[in-house]
């Protein structure tokens, strides 16, 4: 179920303020955030946002195609470790 149109997209207030400040100043710096649920808006395009995955911050460069998606979609939280095939000869 999608979010109601009259509410608008969810964006963390502190993240929105920092994005607006960067747009006014014209600086390019990496913003750290823990808000994986924030929706990417057109103001964020061209910025690099370091999103927390539960262990460390991963830098995400925001492009046009990402608008409307959540920040957490681009940072995996789980690492897949392949199943090691057992060495049967060593067990004997």
UniProtKB/Swiss-Prot annotation:
It is found in: Plastid, Chloroplast. It holds the Pfam family Ribosomal_S19. GO terms for molecular function: rRNA binding; structural constituent of ribosome. Its main location: plastid. The keyword Ribosomal protein applies. SUPFAM superfamilies: Ribosomal protein S19 (SSF54570). InterPro entries: Ribosomal_uS19, Ribosomal_uS19_bac-type, Ribosomal_uS19_CS, Ribosomal_uS19_SF. PANTHER family: RIBOSOMAL PROTEIN S19P FAMILY MEMBER, SMALL RIBOSOMAL SUBUNIT PROTEIN US19M. HAMAP family: Ribosomal_uS19. Belongs to the universal ribosomal protein uS19 family. This is Small ribosomal subunit protein uS19c. It comes from Pyropia yezoensis (Susabi-nori). The lineage of its organism: Eukaryota, Rhodophyta, Bangiophyceae, Bangiales, Bangiaceae.
């Amino acid at each position: 179920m999608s979010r109601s149109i009259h509410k608008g997209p969810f964006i963390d207030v502190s993240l929105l303020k920092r994005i607006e400040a960067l747009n006014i100043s014209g600086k390019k710096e990496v913003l750290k955030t823990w808000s994986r649920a924030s929706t990417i808006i057109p103001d964020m395009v061209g910025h690099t946002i370091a999103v927390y995955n539960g262990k460390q911050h991963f830098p995400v460069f925001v492009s046009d195609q990402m608008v409307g998606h959540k920040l957490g979609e681009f940072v995996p939280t789980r690492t897949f470790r392949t199943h090691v095939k057992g060495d049967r000869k060593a067990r004997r």
